[in-house]
Amino acid sequence: MVSVQNLKTDQLLNFLFKNPTKFLSRFSPMAKNKTLVTPSTVKKSSDVASTSKKLSGVASPAKKPSGVTSPVKKPLEAVASTSSEEEEEDEPSSDSESGSESESDTEAEPMTLAAAAPSSSNEKRQSEGKPEEERAKTETETGKKPLLFQRLWTDEDEIVFLQGMIKFAKDTGKNVSEDMNGFFEKLKDSISFEVKTDQFVNKIRSMKRKYIENKKTTTEHDKKCYELAEIIWVSDGDATALVKPKKKKLKVDEESDWFERSFVDGAFKELGPGVDEETWKKNWSLVPVKKRKRIEEKVKSMQADELKTTWQKIDVVHEMRSLMAKYV
């Protein structure tokens, strides 16, 4: 007798269609287990199998199509096949989970790189902003911005410098331009910084230009410096002695020459016999300048009148000679 378990699917179907009553009587235990196969169920299963084949022919882009179990399998192998299919379905899920984890890992790596790139740019910006922050910090600590040009000469240095020029001329009788080295050696220790000779020369020029030529007196310090500069370069007293001693000497010589050329010298000798010429010159030099100039103008006017009178005398003499030549 042929066993149903050893029959193939086609043979089982033929046997079922030919001997349905015999099949039901022989295999009643299978009917009790609800595994009985009738022609209607076989027809339905064939339809399902054909439909599953059609569906399995279409490939899914995301996942592999899961295999559809045919209902016309061997009865004893059904449970094992279903359990194996469940295990296979579990395995792809685990594979998909591992794949999703790997995909998440691969996606996380660019994110970390992208996050690292802005951090490096932020560090660069922070490093570039450090000098500005340090400069702002120094400004807040000191309370003022750092000066691009620091002034060497202080107000006190300028006052000491001008006073030193006046004192040097009085003590030595020399102009600072005549003995710049001596003036430098005498005053360099009184300046607040380590000064050089060329700085002394430039300072004299700049202060003369500022206070004498431009007459800049905007502050109290400028006013004090202007007063000292007037003593050195403007006034008749100390200015002539400090800055222009040669011109004054020349002026004194011109006055002495005028004194000698004028008739006053002879008149003094006539009016005061017994007084030598040097005494007269010395006494005359003690007279104020304005009064001496007034006398000088009078003398020049008298000399001009005398010259005019002399030319008139000469004209008279020529006229007399011409008349005598005509009538003699």
UniProtKB/Swiss-Prot annotation:
Signal peptide: none annotated. One of its GO terms (biological process) is regulation of DNA-templated transcription. Residues 31-143 are annotated as: Disordered. The keyword Transcription regulation applies. Keywords: Transcription, Transcription regulation. Residues 35-54 have a biased composition (Polar residues). It comes from the Eukaryota. Residues 122-143 have a biased composition (Basic and acidic residues). Belongs to the GeBP family. This is Probable transcription factor At4g00610. It comes from Arabidopsis thaliana (Mouse-ear cress).
